[in-house]
Amino acid sequence: VHLTAEEKDAVLGLWGKVNVQEVGGEALGRLLVVYPWTQRFFESFGDLSSADAVMNNPKVKAHGKKVLDSFADGLKHLDNLKGTFAALSELHCDQLHVDPENFRLLGNELVVVLARTFGKEFTPELQAAYQKVVAGVANALAHRYH
């Protein structure tokens, strides 16, 4: 991902304020609610029958945190996202058979949740920088599919 020094500083600066448990759970929950076909990958999570059930599901929250912990690892390696996410790309492609479009959808949900969480602090410039990052991560996760 190509970010200017200012974009990188802004992305990392905001990320230091992110509660990965809350933001991760909300982002994954929103993905499962807005794009219900994604729920098929999470059948072992129990009750996903309504928006409330999804958003309050402890397994959704826990997996959302796990996803954002991996995303945070990517932020430390912005110059090598494909290498950073190679094992996860292989897992999601070869074993889980996740449609790679879902990575882009989740990235967009993450940006929405960051905007909701940080309000005016999440400026248009910061949003643009985060869009670059989530697109880069989605591309890295989809790498095995190509």
Swiss-Prot record:
This protein's UniProt keywords: Acetylation, Heme, Iron, Metal-binding, Oxygen transport, Phosphoprotein, S-nitrosylation, Transport
SUPFAM superfamilies in UniProt: Globin-like
Swiss-Prot/TrEMBL GO biological process terms: hydrogen peroxide catabolic process
Species whose genome carries this gene: Hippopotamus amphibius
Name the UniProt record assigns to this protein: Hemoglobin subunit beta
Residues recorded as bearing Phosphoserine in the entry: S44
Record-listed N-acetylvaline modification sites: V1
Domain of life where this protein originates: Eukaryota
Subunit composition and interactions: Heterotetramer of two alpha chains and two beta chains.
Positions bearing N6-acetyllysine: K59, K82
One Pfam family it belongs to: Globin
Residue ranges constituting the Globin domain according to the UniProt record: 2-146
Family, similarity comment: Belongs to the globin family.
